[in-house]
């Protein structure tokens, strides 16, 4: 069989597994808002089956729209009794439509920039320096909303872009002060590189505190998930090749991530994209080293954070879809939060329900994404938490927007930021105690 997104062979096999039970209706965030069969997994499978049988063609009105009414959140995959990989059926069908109908010209331009790190860095640096001219600052969130209608919804809150991308602010090799336990590569992802550099700085601090040597490869760029999600399988494949070549050359023990979607790209999609190439074995070797930072910290380093004091805070946790259902990381962030003595952790009723972001979905379907987000805001508010903690930059952006739109009062932070603050506070306490002992 060819690679899953290269032809429709994989999709054909997966479609045949579906017994049309409708269990997916219970968990699909989009269906729960629209109640339209074409938006749920079963409906999409019927559409793809019709496409495979020639009953519809790629230009059929409504086909592309329905195939893009999917967050690829994997909730349907998780509940499917037949094990149908519905998200990959959707990705394969989107790729087929692009092969037959072509890619929208604007997407071509955007994906070309995303695929070229120097162009991306230049564009994002200019954006950071001139953001105030196009966007207005929001006091409540610290983010920005558009001043003019230029493709973004005027209500959309976007983060403050860094004046200088994170990767430009650190050396490639970062050694701890003490003996190094492990040597890891850090894939920053776009959000922590350009939008939330404090997440990346916090990661570096946590690794330093645990005597982990960190390599930050300068030639890394976008993981390719947004490109693959829009059906540009060719560019996604090129991006996968770039990263496999880069990371296979590094003598590291693990490749660590602060974003579940980026990690899932390396772990799952790169071997799939490169299955029919001579880089397949290398892709599998790279994938075998992929870990979320929290998984690595607790299960490899076996760090003990129970003695780290920080500011007293009540928090809840939102599960990023690809981190929980894709990477299987669920317990580790909660264990970190529960073990910090000054953090009171309160679980939501539906912590694993998608926030409605799905990267660019919240840009192209803003109102629907906010309808989905409203449920999350209500769930958050019911906990009485002051801070919502999560493990994905895209989720941080969406949750921040939702707090503003629906009158929430929570700060949104990444788990690694909470832990980094605790390490910093512990160091301050240690300095104070040493000073006290010297003055006695």
Language model features by range: what are they?
Residues 1-20, 33-36, 49-72, 311, ...:
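Ferredoxin-like iron-sulfur electron-transfer modules
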Residues 1-7, 31-62, 83-110, 408-416:
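Non-heme iron-sulfur electron-transfer modules
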Residues 4, 14-17, 38, 56, ...:
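Hydrophobic alpha-helical scaffolding
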Residues 12-13, 29, 75, 185-189, ...:
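Glycine- and acidic
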Residues 13-22, 26, 68-78, 221, ...:
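Cys/His-enriched microdomains
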Residues 16, 35-39, 227-234:
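Alpha-helix capping and helix-loop boundary segments enriched in small/acidic/polar residues
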Residues 19, 23-47, 64, 69-96, ...:
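Iron-sulfur cluster-binding cysteine motifs and their immediate structural context
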């Amino acid at each position: 069989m060819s690679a899953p997104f290269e032809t429709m062979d994989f999709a054909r096999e997966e479609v045949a597994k579906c017994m049309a039970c409708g269990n997916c209706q219970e968990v699909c965030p989009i269906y729960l808002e629209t109640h339209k069969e074409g938006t749920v997994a079963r409906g999409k499978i019927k559409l793809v089956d019709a496409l495979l049988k020639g009953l519809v063609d790629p230009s059929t009105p409504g086909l592309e729209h329905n195939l893009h009414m999917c967050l690829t959140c994997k909730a349907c995959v998780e509940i499917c009794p037949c094990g149908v990989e519905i998200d990959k059926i959707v990705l394969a069908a989107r790729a087929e439509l692009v092969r037959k109908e072509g890619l929208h010209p604007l997407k071509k331009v955007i994906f070309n920039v995303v695929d070229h790190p120097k162009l991306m860095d230049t564009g994002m640096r200019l954006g950071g320096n001139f953001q105030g001219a196009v966007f207005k600052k929001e006091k409540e969130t610290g983010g920005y909303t558009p001043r003019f209608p230029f493709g973004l919804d005027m209500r959309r809150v976007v983060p403050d872009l860094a004046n200088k991308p994170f990767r430009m602010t650190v050396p490639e090799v970062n050694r701890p002060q003490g003996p190094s336990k492990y040597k890891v590569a850090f894939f920053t992802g776009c959000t922590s590189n350009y939008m939330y550099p404090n997440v990346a700085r916090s990661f570096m601090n946590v690794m330093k505190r645990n005597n982990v040597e960190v390599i930050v490869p300068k030639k890394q760029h976008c993981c390719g998930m947004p490109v693959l999600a829009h059906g540009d399988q060719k560019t996604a494949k090129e991006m996968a090749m770039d990263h496999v070549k880069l990371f296979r050359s590094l003598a590291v023990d693990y490749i660590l991530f602060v974003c579940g979607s980026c990690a899932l790209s390396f772990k799952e999609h790169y071997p799939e994209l490169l299955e029919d190439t001579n880089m397949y074995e290398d892709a599998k070797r790279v994938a075998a080293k992929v870990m979320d930072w929290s998984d690595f910290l607790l299960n490899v380093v076996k760090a003990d954070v129970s003695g780290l004091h920080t500011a007293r805070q009540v928090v809840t946790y939102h599960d990023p879809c690809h981190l929980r259902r894709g990477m299987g990381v669920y317990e580790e962030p909660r264990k970190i939060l529960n073990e910090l003595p000054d953090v009171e952790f309160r679980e939501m009723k539906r912590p694993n329900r998608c926030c409605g972001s799905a990267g660019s979905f919240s840009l192209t379907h803003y109102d629907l994404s906010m309808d989905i987000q409203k449920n999350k805001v209500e769930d958050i508010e019911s906990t009485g938490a002051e801070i919502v903690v999560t493990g994905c930059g895209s989720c941080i952006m969406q949750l921040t927007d939702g707090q503003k739109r629906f009158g929430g009062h929570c700060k949104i932070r990444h788990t690694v930021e909470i832990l980094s603050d605790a390490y910093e506070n512990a160091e301050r306490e240690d300095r104070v105690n040493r000073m006290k002992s010297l003055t006695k």
